[in-house]
């Protein structure tokens, strides 16, 4: 029954205890007619989400579709899923993002542009050659953390091919309306120490 937010009532939600994360969860549960106070919050220290939910049927975990859900599929672990952005489009925020120092951007704009051009080239290679890109990642892992997860890496890369650019004009482009919708909500809910305001915190000026 955890295929809808209200179904989290009486269950255990594994949280990173981030104010924004918890406010988003509260929003979708209440929007679905649920009572957020009936969702038990416990600290999230899980590293293998698929195995955790297999062993703990009452657990709900915030995961990345392109990794954890694919891992669950590979390991044949049945799961209920809730896609937050489908329930509230405001929560379709950009993740991950590249962060730069304002003074650096002002003083060395050409370096920033060159860095983004090189980064774009790498992403485009991954889009055009997902299997090769996955193998490069596997071969470059000198920590051993990906050992035994080679198939997961490859299937994840196949999924991410359609996510790197998605509906954007080009790689790296940030749609102001989409950006503002989320951070206006953060401002409205007073979830950050300072308000951001419209069209702040991002730039498309350094993209080729």
Q: Predicted segment positions?
A:
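Short helix-capping segments at alpha-helix termini
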Residues: 31-36, 75-77, 143-145, 191-193
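Bilobed "Venus flytrap"/periplasmic-binding protein-like clamshell domains
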Residues: 1-75, 90-93, 180
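Secondary-structure end/capping motifs
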Residues: 107-189
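Short linear loop/turn motifs
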Residues: 86-87, 151-159, 196-207
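Pocket-lining segment of extracytoplasmic ligand-binding domains
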Residues: 48-52, 56-143
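Conserved C-terminal helix/tail region of periplasmic/extracytoplasmic solute-binding proteins
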Residues: 179-208
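Residue-level signal for threonine
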Residues: 101, 175, 203-205
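A general structural signal for short secondary-structure boundary/capping elements
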Residues: 40-44, 57-63, 86-90, 143-149, ...
């Amino acid at each position: 029954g955890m295929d809808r937010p209200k179904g989290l009532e009486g269950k255990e939600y594994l949280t990173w205890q981030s104010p924004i994360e918890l406010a988003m969860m509260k929003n979708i549960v209440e929007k679905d007619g649920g009572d957020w106070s009936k969702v038990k919050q416990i600290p999230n220290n899980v590293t293998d989400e698929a195995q955790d939910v297999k062993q703990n049927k009452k657990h709900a975990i915030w995961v990345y579709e392109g990794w954890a859900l694919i891992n669950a599929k590979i390991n044949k672990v049945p799961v209920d899923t809730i896609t937050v952005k489908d329930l509230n489009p405001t929560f379709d925020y950009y993740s991950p993002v590249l962060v730069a120092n304002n003074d650096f951007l002002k003083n060395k704009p050409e370096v920033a542009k060159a860095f983004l051009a090189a980064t774009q080239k790498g992403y485009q290679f991954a889009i055009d050659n997902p299997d090769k890109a996955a193998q490069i990642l596997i071969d470059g892992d000198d920590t051993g953390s990906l050992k035994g997860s080679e198939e997961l890496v490859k299937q994840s890369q196949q999924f991410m091919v359609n996510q790197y650019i998605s509906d954007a004009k080009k790689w790296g482009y940030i749609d102001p309306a989409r950006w503002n919708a989320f951070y206006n909500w953060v401002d409205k809910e007073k979830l950050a120490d300072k308000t951001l305001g419209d069209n702040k915190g991002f730039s498309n000026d350094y993209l080729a």
